[in-house]
Amino acid sequence: MIPTYMNIMLAFTISLLGMLTYRSHLVASLLCLEGMMMSLFIMATLIASNTHFPLINIMPIILLVFAACEAAVGLALLISISNTYGLDYIHNLNLLQC
């Protein structure tokens, strides 16, 4: 396997482990999720540049759109939780409460 792909897969794995380890704080979870999305974007860009299939070139752009939407929703949720509770703990997030 090419070392570039291995480094990107290692970055994704480290971000995934960080997501599983630091799941009590929303800021840490959002940063790890953003790291996972960026490593997926780099991997998709490398795959799109190495293959000569023209329809796959749009895949990294679509992935960036989803990453931007995920970041916007995550930051809005962070602001809402920090204004309501004053903390960024995920266990404060309960959607069943009114």
Swiss-Prot record:
It catalyses: a ubiquinone + NADH + 5 H(+)(in) = a ubiquinol + NAD(+) + 4 H(+)(out). The keyword Transport applies. One of its GO terms (molecular function) is NADH dehydrogenase (ubiquinone) activity. One of its GO terms (biological process) is ATP synthesis coupled electron transport. Pfam families: Oxidored_q2. Keywords: Electron transport, Membrane, Mitochondrion, Mitochondrion inner membrane, NAD, Respiratory chain, Translocase, Transmembrane, Transmembrane helix, Transport, Ubiquinone. The chain crosses the membrane at residues 1-21, 27-47, 61-81. It is found in: Mitochondrion inner membrane. Its main location: mitochondrion. It is a multi-pass membrane protein. Its EC number is 7.1.1.2. InterPro entries: NADH_UbQ_OxRdtase_chain4L/K, NUOK/Mnh_C1-like. GO terms for cellular component: mitochondrial inner membrane; respiratory chain complex I. Core subunit of the mitochondrial membrane respiratory chain NADH dehydrogenase (Complex I) which catalyzes electron transfer from NADH through the respiratory chain, using ubiquinone as an electron acceptor. Part of the enzyme membrane arm which is embedded in the lipid bilayer and involved in proton translocation. Core subunit of respiratory chain NADH dehydrogenase (Complex I) which is composed of 45 different subunits. Belongs to the complex I subunit 4L family. This is NADH-ubiquinone oxidoreductase chain 4L. It comes from Macaca hecki.
